[in-house]
From Swiss-Prot:
Keywords: Cell wall, Cell wall biogenesis/degradation, Glycoprotein, Membrane, Secreted, Signal. This is Expansin-A19. GO terms for biological process: plant-type cell wall loosening. Residues 1-21 form the signal peptide. The lineage of its organism: Eukaryota, Viridiplantae, Streptophyta, Embryophyta, Tracheophyta. InterPro entries: Expan_Lol_pI (IPR007118), Expansin (IPR002963), Expansin/allergen_DPBB_dom (IPR007112), Expansin_CBD (IPR007117), Expansin_CBD_sf (IPR036749), RlpA-like_DPBB (IPR009009), RlpA-like_sf (IPR036908). Glycans are attached at residues 116, 216.
Length: 249
């Protein structure tokens, strides 16, 4: 049976591109109910995952995977490690999920539980998890790797905050799915470096109300895109603006 699993792993690796060559071991549980509705919101700040382009195939990431929010939006290909749990794995099945939430350690449990500070663990939406695992297992050993994200449409920017505080939520990002650095430019300013506030929310203290806004975004994959005038003058806090540009890596 071990040979069958190795053959399956090779087939999955050949069919997924582009992808990193290394499969990494981890574990996975599920949450959010049979319809996944309990996974909406989360520590990345995406809110309604359907509206933001992520859907039901999502996961809360343990501390080493979440990386203080720097991994928000990244995509992971996951298979159940059949060689370790043949009774609980669905042979030949794989699922790609987006990191949308944080799974914190539970220090009421020994060593902080499954989402302890050192374990690579995915607390997946139940519908996503059931693609690869048998429900009664509860937790399964997995193999995973980060893969390219695919999204419909362009990158979106939601402008939150107040007065001299701009908090920009970046969503629907393809390619590596996550942001390494970001700057903003008003129609009356030069480029202003932004910093991560929390999750996929980036901030600046510039007082840009009333100005058209451009963004310079570099993905964790190393691609930089300048979104010229992504937000028109006269915008209001709480508005979302879609673009025609998208990341490849």
């Amino acid at each position: 049976m071990g040979n069958i699993f190795l053959q399956l792993l090779a087939v999955v690796a050949l069919c997924i591109a582009p992808a990193r060559s290394d499969w990494l071991p981890g574990t996975a549980t599920f949450y959010g109910g049979a319809d996944g509705s309990g996974t909406m919101g989360g520590a990345c700040g995406y809110g309604n995952l359907y509206d933001q382009g992520y859907g039901i195939n999502n996961a809360a990431l343990s501390t080493p995977l979440f990386n203080d929010g720097a991994s928000c939006g990244q995509c992971y290909l996951i298979i159940c490690d059949y060689s370790k749990a043949p009774d609980w794995c669905k042979l030949g099945k794989a699922i790609t999920v987006t990191g949308t939430n944080y799974c914190p350690p539970n220090y009421d449990l020994p060593y902080g539980g499954w989402c302890n500070a050192t374990r690579p663990h995915f607390d997946m939406s139940q519908p996503a998890w059931e693609n690869i695992g048998i429900y009664n297992a509860g937790i399964i050993p997995i193999l995973y790797q980060q893969v390219k994200c695919w999204r419909y449409g362009g990158v979106r920017f939601t402008i939150n905050g107040f007065n001299y505080f701009e908090l920009v939520l970046v969503t629907n990002m393809a390619g590596s799915g996550s942001i390494a650095s970001m700057s903003v430019k008003g129609s009356c300013t030069g480029w202003i470096q932004m910093t991560r506030n929390w999750g996929a929310n980036w901030q600046c203290l510039a007082g840009l109300a009333g100005q058209a806004l451009s963004f310079n975004v570099t993905s964790t994959g190393g691609q930089t895109i300048v979104f010229d005038d992504a937000v028109p003058a006269g915008w209001s806090f709480g508005q979302t603006f879609s673009t025609y540009h998208q990341f490849d890596y």
